[in-house]
């Protein structure tokens, strides 16, 4: 009897479990998640400038948004912001200096709810971004401060 039950239990299918994705830093609210991960510069561009006095530090910025927008004008404004305006809402604090990104490029074709972009800062050689600040001028994220110097 025991062998029959053991044999039957091995054939039962187990529902697949989705692994929870962990990010360097993330903040969430109902139906939305904003996250940040480090990104290898070679994915986006060169590691350093031509003179060699500065280096690039890249981050992957993700926005998962399941809020449905039905107004066509609002959709257009949102797209314009995500592609062109969001870059200017980011600031890196590096050794007490505030730096704006030099480049932001969206990853194409990720699906309706997920948007990811490579965000690149030019920093002095050997320096790291201590903090990234996001001041949302479009939506309702407000000001988000991502302290990175304690996260290695």
Model-derived features with residue positions:
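Conserved functional micro-motifs across diverse proteins
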Residues: 10-152
